[in-house]
Amino acid sequence: MAMAVFRREGRRLLPSIAARPIAAIRSPLSSDQEEGLLGVRSISTQVVRNRMKSVKNIQKITKAMKMVAASKLRAVQGRAENSRGLWQPFTALLGDNPSIDVKKSVVVTLSSDKGLCGGINSTVVKVSRALYKLNAGPEKEVQFVIVGEKAKAIMFRDSKNDIVLSVTELNKNPLNYAQVSVLADDILKNVEFDALRIVYNKFHSVVAFLPTVSTVLSPEIIEKESEIGGKLGELDSYEIEGGETKGEILQNLAEFQFSCVMFNAVLENACSEMGARMSAMDSSSRNAGEMLDRLTLTYNRTRQASITTELIEIISGASALEAAK
């Protein structure tokens, strides 16, 4: 009986409870923030305008970087083409034997110190790792010489113990043969090898570069191969004049061949870097232009919607005043 009375009283009180006004709760936001939340269109317009300004600044930077890369490419390209005449006679004389089987191989990986140049650095790293797998074995040793900050950063992750020498900031100053020959001399003094395999990007055009491997054999391997015969067997047909022995002559030829091949490889890789950076910056500039067009369209639509809303509010207010009269 008591429960029935309680239920009746509850039903009688329920409408009055539901109709009670909800107490006002002060917002934790400041007046400016509340104003901003209510004015969504004005905020979105400002955000789009700021975004457009950022994209314009980025587009200016990418265009400037493209022009700088084009200027550097013109300066290096002619020297790279001229340097091809240095190593070609040595390749004709001593050969280029990428498939030769030796016990000690050293892979010289050439990369850039700076980024924003497409996939030239990842490409030479992939080729270097493939050479490591091909030449590694139970009685074989493969080591790395890294030239450039980008390849160094990638190779240090999983091949740190196999890196015997790393060189950075080679392109800080204009490249010349004396600078590269000092680098080649350091490699020859600090690294024991039977074959040096130089991995670099050969320049073809602004949008095309070819990963290339050039092989330089040690004097001992050259002499051994010349005794066996084949292409290197033709070395015995040359008459040696002066007091130098065949081993000393081969030593000098191998060292000079390595420095010439390195000089050409460094210049070819520098051309590929500048060409790839030109292409990347041109693509970035075009993408920024397309993004700017979309943002301009969004800004105009948002602004038009805001103006339309304000006009509707003005007309509605005027109509209400007319009706009140």
Swiss-Prot record:
Name the Gene3D superfamilies for this protein. 3.40.1380.10, ATP synthase, gamma subunit, helix hairpin domain (1.10.287.80)
Concerning InterPro entries, the annotation shows: ATP_synth_F1_ATPase_gsu, ATP_synth_F1_gsu, ATP_synth_F1_gsu_CS
Q: GO cellular component terms?
A: chloroplast; cytoplasm; endoplasmic reticulum; mitochondrial inner membrane; mitochondrion; nucleolus; nucleus; plant-type cell wall
Asked if the keyword Hydrolase belongs to this entry, the reply reads no
Kindly list the places in or outside the cell where this protein is found, as annotated in its UniProt entry: Mitochondrion; Mitochondrion inner membrane
| Pfam families per the UniProt record, alphabetical | ATP-synt (PF00231)
Per the record, the major location class is: mitochondrion
Q: Where is the transit peptide?
A: 1-42
Q: Which UniProt keywords apply?
A: ATP synthesis, CF(1), Hydrogen ion transport, Ion transport, Membrane, Mitochondrion, Mitochondrion inner membrane, Transit peptide, Transport
The membrane-topology field of this record reads: Peripheral membrane protein
GO molecular function ontology, one term from the record = proton-transporting ATP synthase activity, rotational mechanism
Q: State the oligomer form and interacting partners.
A: F-type ATPases have 2 components, CF(1) - the catalytic core - and CF(0) - the membrane proton channel. CF(1) has five subunits: alpha(3), beta(3), gamma(1), delta(1), epsilon(1). CF(0) has three main subunits: a, b and c.
Protein's job: Mitochondrial membrane ATP synthase (F(1)F(0) ATP synthase or Complex V) produces ATP from ADP in the presence of a proton gradient across the membrane which is generated by electron transport complexes of the respiratory chain. F-type ATPases consist of two structural domains, F(1) - containing the extramembraneous catalytic core, and F(0) - containing the membrane proton channel, linked together by a central stalk and a peripheral stalk. During catalysis, ATP synthesis in the catalytic domain of F(1) is coupled via a rotary mechanism of the central stalk subunits to proton translocation.
What NCBIfam families does the database record attribute to this sequence? ATPsyn_F1gamma (TIGR01146)
Record HAMAP family: ATP_synth_gamma_bact (MF_00815)
- UniProt name for this protein: ATP synthase subunit gamma, mitochondrial
Which species? Arabidopsis thaliana
Source lineage: Eukaryota, Viridiplantae, Streptophyta, Embryophyta, Tracheophyta
Gene behind this chain? Answer: ATPC
